[in-house]
């Protein structure tokens, strides 16, 4: 198997345990703050990751393998979690995500080979994309949202850090993405 597939799935396999370690059992006061003023709380991010597991990554992988570029991917409902997951405890969302991710990675390992990586699909707004690009995006998408979760957790104590705020880039970037800690 291409090192790319093994390396990418190894990273993807770590996300459920990272989320368990980071979020399960934390008080709601830590998890109710969005990463930016109009951003997502950690629970929203986990819900968004669940949506990806249900309707995006493996669905698009199968679409590439079965149809190539002849059938475009469905659009991704980025905000589906807001209504679907209202009132669901965060710990339950983390466990739901873990089950879905583990099942998807098991299916992925059975489904693709190195030879499939350059096969192409059709994204509704980006045009043609390769399976390799889709899988790389899946992994980087995790990293992007893990950073978002950390920013939300840090934001829950924004006021409490007092004058040290000017040294904490994770807090400064909540208001100005280009900010660098002092």
Question: At which residue positions do the language-model features occur?
Answer:
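Small-residue-biased structural context
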Residues: 8-12, 16-24, 80-90, 102, ...
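Surface-exposed helix-capping loop/turn segments at secondary-structure junctions
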Residues: 24-31, 109-118, 155-158
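Short, contiguous, pocket-lining structural segments
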Residues: 4-14, 37, 96, 126, ...
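Short, contiguous alpha-helical
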Residues: 32-76, 105, 121-182
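Acidic/histidine-rich alpha-helical segments that form the ligand environment
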Residues: 15, 78-119, 129, 133-141, ...
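Alpha-helical bundle segments that constitute or directly flank the non-heme di-iron/ferroxidase center
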Residues: 1-30, 52-63
């Amino acid at each position: 198997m291409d090192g790319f597939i093994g390396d990418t799935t190894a990273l993807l396999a770590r996300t459920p345990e990272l989320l368990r370690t980071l979020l399960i059992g934390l008080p709601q006061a830590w998890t109710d703050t969005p990463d930016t003023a109009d951003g997502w709380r950690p629970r929203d991010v986990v819900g968004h990751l669940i949506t990806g597991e249900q309707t995006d990554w493996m669905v698009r992988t199968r679409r590439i393998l079965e149809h190539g570029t002849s059938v475009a991917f469905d659009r991704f409902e980025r905000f589906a979690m807001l209504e679907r997951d209202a009132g669901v405890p965060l710990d339950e969302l983390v466990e739901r995500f873990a089950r879905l991710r583990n099942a998807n990675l098991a299916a992925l390992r059975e489904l693709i080979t190195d030879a499939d990586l350059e096969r192409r699909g059709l994204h509704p707004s980006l045009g043609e994309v390769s399976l390799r690009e889709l899988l790389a995006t899946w992994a980087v998408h995790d990293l992007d949202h893990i950073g978002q979760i950390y920013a939300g957790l840090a934001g829950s104590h924004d006021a409490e850090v007092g004058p040290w705020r000017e040294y904490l880039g994770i807090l400064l970037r909540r208001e100005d993405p280009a900010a660098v800690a002092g």
